Amino acid sequence: MRDPVSSQYSSFLFWRMPIPELDLSELEGLGLSDSPTYKSKESNSIGKMGGQATGAERKSPEGDPLLEYSTFNFWRAPIASIRSIDLDLL
Protein backbone atom coordinates (compact mmCIF):
# COMPACT_ATOMS: atom_id res chain seq x y z
CA MET A 1 0.00 0.00 0.00
CA ARG A 2 1.22 3.48 -0.86
CA ASP A 3 2.18 5.99 1.77
CA PRO A 4 -0.63 8.63 1.84
CA VAL A 5 1.78 11.48 2.61
CA SER A 6 4.09 10.81 -0.35
CA SER A 7 1.15 10.23 -2.72
CA GLN A 8 -0.24 13.64 -1.72
CA TYR A 9 2.89 15.41 -2.94
CA SER A 10 3.19 13.35 -6.12
CA SER A 11 -0.26 14.28 -7.38
CA PHE A 12 -0.83 16.75 -10.17
CA LEU A 13 -3.35 18.74 -8.13
CA PHE A 14 -0.78 19.47 -5.43
CA TRP A 15 1.93 20.83 -7.72
CA ARG A 16 -0.12 22.66 -10.35
CA MET A 17 -0.34 26.44 -10.28
CA PRO A 18 -3.54 27.71 -8.66
CA ILE A 19 -6.12 29.30 -10.92
CA PRO A 20 -5.94 33.07 -10.41
CA GLU A 21 -8.96 34.88 -9.04
CA LEU A 22 -10.98 36.87 -11.53
CA ASP A 23 -10.51 40.62 -11.16
CA LEU A 24 -13.89 42.28 -11.64
CA SER A 25 -12.29 45.62 -12.50
CA GLU A 26 -10.77 44.00 -15.61
CA LEU A 27 -14.22 42.80 -16.66
CA GLU A 28 -15.61 46.30 -16.20
CA GLY A 29 -12.86 47.61 -18.46
CA LEU A 30 -13.94 45.14 -21.14
CA GLY A 31 -17.61 45.98 -20.67
CA LEU A 32 -18.50 42.42 -19.63
CA SER A 33 -19.29 42.89 -15.94
CA ASP A 34 -23.00 43.60 -16.40
CA SER A 35 -23.69 40.36 -18.30
CA PRO A 36 -22.55 37.24 -16.40
CA THR A 37 -21.85 34.40 -18.82
CA TYR A 38 -21.46 31.59 -16.31
CA LYS A 39 -23.05 30.99 -12.94
CA SER A 40 -21.04 30.04 -9.91
CA LYS A 41 -21.06 26.47 -8.65
CA GLU A 42 -23.19 27.39 -5.63
CA SER A 43 -26.05 28.68 -7.78
CA ASN A 44 -26.24 25.56 -9.97
CA SER A 45 -28.50 22.69 -9.09
CA ILE A 46 -27.00 19.26 -8.45
CA GLY A 47 -28.01 17.80 -11.81
CA LYS A 48 -26.52 20.57 -13.95
CA MET A 49 -22.97 20.97 -15.10
CA GLY A 50 -21.23 24.32 -14.50
CA GLY A 51 -21.19 25.53 -18.09
CA GLN A 52 -24.65 24.36 -19.16
CA ALA A 53 -27.74 26.52 -19.06
CA THR A 54 -31.42 25.79 -19.59
CA GLY A 55 -33.31 27.32 -22.48
CA ALA A 56 -34.54 30.23 -20.36
CA GLU A 57 -31.02 30.98 -19.08
CA ARG A 58 -29.34 31.04 -22.48
CA LYS A 59 -28.69 34.41 -24.02
CA SER A 60 -29.63 35.24 -27.54
CA PRO A 61 -26.73 34.88 -30.00
CA GLU A 62 -27.07 38.53 -31.01
CA GLY A 63 -26.51 39.69 -27.42
CA ASP A 64 -23.24 37.85 -26.82
CA PRO A 65 -20.25 40.00 -27.85
CA LEU A 66 -17.82 37.04 -27.74
CA LEU A 67 -19.92 34.62 -29.81
CA GLU A 68 -17.98 35.22 -33.03
CA TYR A 69 -14.74 34.10 -31.34
CA SER A 70 -16.20 30.92 -29.88
CA THR A 71 -17.56 29.44 -33.09
CA PHE A 72 -15.84 26.84 -35.22
CA ASN A 73 -16.00 29.02 -38.32
CA PHE A 74 -13.90 31.77 -36.74
CA TRP A 75 -10.94 29.54 -35.88
CA ARG A 76 -10.79 27.30 -38.95
CA ALA A 77 -8.74 28.13 -42.01
CA PRO A 78 -10.73 29.98 -44.68
CA ILE A 79 -11.85 28.07 -47.74
CA ALA A 80 -9.80 28.97 -50.78
CA SER A 81 -11.81 30.76 -53.43
CA ILE A 82 -11.78 29.15 -56.87
CA ARG A 83 -12.76 31.19 -59.87
CA SER A 84 -14.54 29.71 -62.86
CA ILE A 85 -11.47 30.41 -65.02
CA ASP A 86 -9.40 28.22 -62.71
CA LEU A 87 -11.95 25.42 -63.00
CA ASP A 88 -11.76 25.58 -66.78
CA LEU A 89 -8.00 25.10 -66.62
CA LEU A 90 -8.40 21.91 -64.61
UniProtKB/Swiss-Prot annotation:
GO biological process: extrinsic apoptotic signaling pathway; intrinsic apoptotic signaling pathway; positive regulation of apoptotic process; positive regulation of DNA-templated transcription; positive regulation of mitochondrial depolarization; positive regulation of release of cytochrome c from mitochondria
Region (Disordered): 33-63
Residue positions, PTM Phosphoserine: S60, S84
Subcellular location: Nucleus; Cytoplasm; Cytoplasm, Cytoskeleton, Microtubule organizing center, Centrosome
Residues annotated as transmembrane: none
Chain positions of motif Nuclear export signal: 24-32
PTM per Swiss-Prot/TrEMBL: Ubiquitinated, leading to degradation.
InterPro entries: MLLT11_fam, WRNPLPNID
Main location: nucleus
Subunit details: Interacts with HSPA8 and LAMP2 isoform A; the interaction may target MLLT11 for degradation via chaperone-mediated autophagy. Interacts with TCF7.
Name of the molecule in the record: Protein AF1q
Organism: Rattus norvegicus
Underlying gene: Mllt11
